Amino acid sequence: MRVSNPFFASRYRETAVLLKATTALLLLLLGRSEVAAEQMWVDFRVAGPFVCRADFSLKGHESVFMELAEIQQDLIKKFGVPPSGERIEIYLFQGRTSYSRFVKRWFPEVPTRRALYIKNNGPGMVLVYLSDQLHTDLRHECTHALLHASLPMVPLWLDEGLAEYYEVPPQDRSHQNPHHNGTVWSFRFGRLRSMEQLENKQELKEMGRSEYRNAWAWVHFMVHGPPAARMELVQFLADIREGTPPGDLSDRLARRFSDPEDALVQHFKTFWK
């Protein structure tokens, strides 16, 4: 999925839709300046590369903006992903009605979802409306935005696996992700998705609940498991960044581990003890 092509991703990730050229051209010509200048915005925040505008007061939400900036620093520290060279715009809406109205006005071809990450030839945009999942949605979509602001491409499964990893608060990422229990039970029933199976998923509509859970599991293994696994992920992302054909990450792990799937299962058996 190349970010030079217009696309969007959403928290309800059943589909991926290419924005028509007319919509992309509208955004480029009428511009983000017109979007940003609308009178509806009543609060404004800056955190790292993120510039946020909201049609409601952001008082009480300060912590999540600190977390968004922290995600960028963590991507640098853990994976060597360079800091974004572009700003990433966030637009927050108090209700679903104003959110849907905005999306239909500026992106009429895009189905309305609870949260959207939109990327065309310019900087990425994150659109979210206020709900009890606001902070989770922001962390998830902004992870996509950071990755695609720094890398020319990210494999779909890895893109989603990293977003699932970072969507929870920092203190919960290693041991308290909601995917953990479901992952353990799926392994007990032999429902492990190999990395090769995930790599074959090319469209968001192919990613169901099981695929997201398994994508997160592989990311957790590479972040918190054997150092050799993280080294392969770091080098994989470095090759993408440098324009070197990266091959499949599964092939890299197979050269490091005689049985990567068993290594994954063993990681989940021992890490939480």
Task: Locate the predicted segments by residue.
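Juxtacatalytic substrate-recognition/specificity segment
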Residues: 38-155, 245-255
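Bacterial Sec-dependent signal peptides at the C-terminal "C-region" and cleavage site
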Residues: 29-40
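N-terminal secretory signal peptides that target proteins for export/translocation
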Residues: 1-17
